[in-house]
Amino acid sequence: MWVSVVLILSMFVSRVAPPHLESNEQPSLAIRTNNEAFNALNSYLSGGEDFNRSLDQELATLRPNSQRENVLMACAEREGTVHAQKDETDLKFRGFAQLSFPLLSDTHVAHAVFNYVDDFAPEVFDSLLTATKDEMSQRQRTTLYVQMNIALDGLETDPRCELLRGAGFELGVVEQASELDLALAQDPEIPAGLRPVYFAGWMPPEEHIKSFLRIMEMSWEDVPATDEAEPQVWTREMIEELHAENARSTKDIANALLVDAEGIAAYSCATIDHDHPEAVSQQITFVHRRARGQGLGMLIKQVLYREVKDRFPDARRIVTFNALDNERMLAINEKLGLRPKFRETSWKLVING
């Protein structure tokens, strides 16, 4: 899919203003084009639509909250102003940069996803990277992480990887995107001393909130998003905000806990977009440090899959991501029947001056 195309036209980059919509009504052509570009790549890599993101999910990623600031940059062949809502201005978009700036921790970091419209062109990458560095400079950010999905053999064959290396980026975490036919999921056998607890959204039952906050902090410590991620304190206010934010979307969250006498021993969750209910996206899976070595990583996934099948009869497949260096979890996924589809890569650039 990715063939480098040389452009002879100048590229113009502008901020989509504002980068979010207060409601989901009438998203602009720029917002829709960015979403279509993201999905086109994932469809090509996976051979289907199960890893795609609905427009509603796209809008949710652009909304600000207390944990992050979001910016969307549009690269086009024509110069002009672009809005997020009620704007059909066509500037001949060639690519977009979705930027996220953490506000509570890692405040020297910026995260970016570059989406290319139709063919990938080095000039578009160069323009988006320059604009990204400008946004970082304004916020005194010095480390950039770019997330990019590639084919299973893409590290050797994808020209975008070569371009990132040439720009000084270093390869970081590589995750494997996998998929499971839910019909193949086996029912769990839960041993004595453990009981499953289920909840929707972000708010667990009151008696488990303290334990839930601790296991989220522990997951951040043990499975950091980047190689230099700082510990993050989770609070009740944070999950209340996330719960309210999720309630505004068409997305539902299914959560499964395994609870013992000391609290939460294992946790996993999955998101279900009702615009595309056939594919369910499994998110975090985490086992408390005190409960490891008992097979709970596999068990909590089976517990979650049963909950998904019970609550969402239209669900047919599970999709998920796991780091390639997490051999234990990859082995669990293989036993469960998940099959690899593509890679999600993270690239790091430290900017001096």
Which residues fall in each region the model found?
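Glycine-rich phosphate-binding loop
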Residues: 123, 295-299
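Short amphipathic alpha-helix that is part of the acyltransferase structural core
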Residues: 2-68, 75, 190-237
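Polar/charged side chains located within well-ordered beta-strands of beta-rich proteins
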Residues: 34-38, 42, 58, 146, ...
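Acyl-donor-binding surface of acyltransferase catalytic domains
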Residues: 1-12, 118-207, 344-349
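Conserved donor-binding loop and adjoining core beta-sheet/short helix segment
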Residues: 17-21, 39-153, 260, 264-288
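Active-site/acyl-donor-binding loops of N-acyltransferases
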Residues: 164-185, 306-353
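A mid-sequence, solvent-exposed acidic-amphipathic segment
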Residues: 236-267
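A conserved short alpha-helix in the GNAT/GCN5 acetyltransferase fold that borders
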Residues: 129-138, 292, 301-309
